[in-house]
Amino acid sequence: MAKGKDVRIRVILQCVSCVRKGANEESAGISRYSTQKNRHNTPGQLELRKFCRYCRKHTIHAEIKK
């Protein structure tokens, strides 16, 4: 039997620089990735360095609320 909530949850990561700029002028859009995180190991907000196809470079992607 499972106890309480699951340890692994699904999170969505969003590009921080695209959000600040309000999306690029040449291509409208915000880069998003979906992944999982372990609540016990990472209780805070998850931030990973991933490739943003709209900025065309590696940027920080932060966890957003659903």
Curated annotation (Swiss-Prot):
Compartments, record wording: Plastid, Chloroplast
Superkingdom of origin organism: Eukaryota
Keyword Transferase: no
Coarse class of the protein's main subcellular location: plastid
Pfam family, one: Ribosomal_L33
Keyword check for Ion transport: no
Molecular-function GO terms, alphabetical: structural constituent of ribosome
GO process annotations (BP): translation
InterPro entries membership: Ribosomal_bL33 (IPR001705), Ribosomal_bL33_CS (IPR018264), Ribosomal_bL33_sf (IPR038584), Ribosomal_zn-bd (IPR011332)
Cellular-component GO terms for this entry: chloroplast; plastid; ribonucleoprotein complex; ribosome
Transmembrane segments: none
Keywords: Chloroplast, Plastid, Ribonucleoprotein, Ribosomal protein
Alphabetized HAMAP family for the sequence: Ribosomal_bL33
Xref: NCBIfam families: PRK00504.1, PRK00595.1, rpmG_bact
Family (UniProt): Belongs to the bacterial ribosomal protein bL33 family.
Name of protein: Large ribosomal subunit protein bL33c
Species, as recorded: Oryza sativa subsp. japonica
Gene that this sequence comes from: rpl33
